[in-house]
Amino acid sequence: RRDIRIGDIMRMSSGIMINAPSDPDYDTSTYADHFYLYTGGVNQYEYAASRPAEYPPNTIGRYRNTDPVLTNYLIRLAVEGRGEDYHSFPQRNLFDKLGIRNALIETDTYGNFLGQGLAFMSARDWARLGNLYLTDGVWNGERLLPEGYVEYASTTAPAWVTDGRPVYGGAFFWVDNDVGDDGIPPSFRMSGAGGQSTTIIPSHELVIVRIGKYTGASEVGAALRQMIP
């Protein structure tokens, strides 16, 4: 585990062992650790940090909540290590600058942000966040994301390529860097439960936000095709 880098964690390539529904060998008779982080009443940061290694880092891509949880843990350690308030950090350093006033990020019972899910904003606010990535991390002349960060987020993660599933990038973005049969040009997106998504399409200077019911999740791809000229 000491060989795991922050970059591996942010590409869902840490190799940390939990069972998750997207695993090829997932046992459907078990309750996934992936969901236990939401429902178990545990300190999710300590739980994720205590999991053993299953694969060498940066060799296998797996969609597992422990990786974004560990990233959030590192952020909390860094923010509080500087003597700053952790719970106002996202609002002060990002949302206020983008004009987002009503973002809600839920926490576990220990006050740790559940950044891997349960983040709520209006469609316009998700579009603001998407536009930050469309403009290479610069907003109103101020660089909010490090130079090269957007390229990192939108580039397919090496471990996922090796694993034969080139669908995940950096910074917890899903990527589609080929024009496939769906006709959607290269894009990357923030994706949530039930088909909630914010898709960034650089070639069209376009951000598309979808917020809706779970029952409409299967129609998202068709809707995107209709929106793109």
Regions found by a protein language model. Give the residues of each.
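Active-site-adjacent helix/loop patches that line small-molecule binding or acyl-intermediate pockets
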Residues: R1-I100, A123-A127, N131-G137
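Extracellular/periplasmic catalytic domains that process cell-envelope and extracellular macromolecules
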Residues: R1-I4, T39-G41, E54, F120, ...
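Residues that flank catalytic or metal-binding motifs in active/ligand-binding sites
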Residues: R2-R5, D67, G115, S122-D125, ...
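Carbohydrate-binding/catalytic loop surfaces
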Residues: T30-D33, D108-M121, G169, W174-D176
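Solvent-exposed loop and edge beta-strand segments that line ligand/cofactor-binding
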Residues: Y55-R64, L114-F120, M190-S197, T215
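Flexible, glycine-rich surface segments
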Residues: P90-R92, D96-V150, S154-P158
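Active-site Gly/Thr loop motif
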Residues: I100-T107, E151-I208
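Short, gly/Ser/Thr-rich active-site loops of penicillin-recognizing serine hydrolases
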Residues: S218-P229
